[in-house]
Regions:
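PAPS-dependent sulfotransferase catalytic core
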Residues: 1-72, 76, 215-222
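PAPS/PAP-binding and catalytic site of the sulfotransferase fold
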Residues: 14-28, 96-101, 179-204
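Short aromatic-enriched loop/helix-cap "lid" or pocket-rim segments at secondary-structure transitions
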Residues: 40-47, 96, 118-122, 128-129, ...
Length: 260
């Protein structure tokens, strides 16, 4: 039987890098962004709809369906330990813990909010992708394309929901969530990975940090509306702009309030 765990956290905080490194372990499979979380949420929606008309033992049937989906979603993967990647597993722990055969565990990547916002904006400027989803939204709202407006939109619609899910999991189930801070991962990768292995209760592994294969890349990356969103560098390094230079000192002060 496979053991199902989860990979969550904030966008632009190293989840693709961490997943690719964990995939080097012979016992671990880390997925790209997965639909499993949406499938689980969809099951609840369907049960709420059919419960009005149909007569059935909802408690028993719910258990059968949820537990079967969670147990069998990755039957085609030969590795015994699965980490399913989705930003919103934190807020889904209430449901998952009732139907999972093992204790739920989330590995959550984290980075300071100003750095996350800066990473998004730097990627836009670096790729010169004019039709990226952020600027498209600003145009539709007749807002000027400025880094200040970009930062506000990114936070409100893309970072805050993931942040709230992560905070929910940390607050309600602290023993089930392990945080991996981006800068620590880049500076001391093996040390951070060993902590993850210990948290997942699996044997340690000596990782390789050169010619890293992007094992968690998104085949449909263009559907995310920004080229290179899930690219990683083959050799472990940090090349980041100073948030003050990108979003300004005042925005750094505002968004730093949300840092853990």
């Amino acid at each position: 039987m496979k053991t199902l765990y989860f990979l969550g956290g904030l966008p632009r905080s190293g989840s693709t890098l961490l997943g690719s490194l964990l995939n080097q372990h012979s016992e671990i499979y880390v997925s790209p962004t997965s639909p499993l979380g949406d499938v689980v949420s969809g099951i609840e929606k369907i049960f709420n709809e059919v419960d009005i008309q149909f007569t059935f033992d909802r408690k028993e049937v719910s258990y059968n369906v949820y537990s079967s989906v969670l147990a069998n979603f990755y039957n085609h993967i030969p590795k015994p330990v699965i980490l399913d990647k989705h930003r919103f597993w934190g807020k889904n722990l209430d449901t998952v813990q009732m139907f999972l055969s093992n204790k739920p565990k989330i590995v959550a990547t984290y980075r300071s909010i100003p750095e996350v916002l800066t990473s998004y904006i730097s990627l836009i400027e670096r790729t010169q992708h004019e039709n990226n989803f952020i600027d498209e939204h600003l145009r539709k709202d007749n807002l000027p394309i400025t880094n200040n407006n970009r930062a506000e939109y990114i936070w409100r619609y893309y970072v805050a929901p993931s942040y709230e899910s992560m905070i929910y999991g940390i607050t309600k189930y602290p023993e089930w969530v392990h945080l991996v801070e981006y800068n620590n991962l880049v500076k001391n990768p093996q040390e951070e990975l060993n902590k993850v292995y210990e948290f997942l209760e699996i044997p340690s592994h000596t990782n390789t940090f050169h010619n890293i294969e992007n094992a968690c890349g998104e085949q449909k990356d263009e559907e995310w509306g920004l080229k290179g969103l899930h690219d990683i560098r083959p050799n472990l390094s940090k090349i980041s702009q100073n948030p003050i230079d990108v979003i300004g000192k005042e925005n750094v002060k505002i968004y730093s309030k949300f840092d853990l």
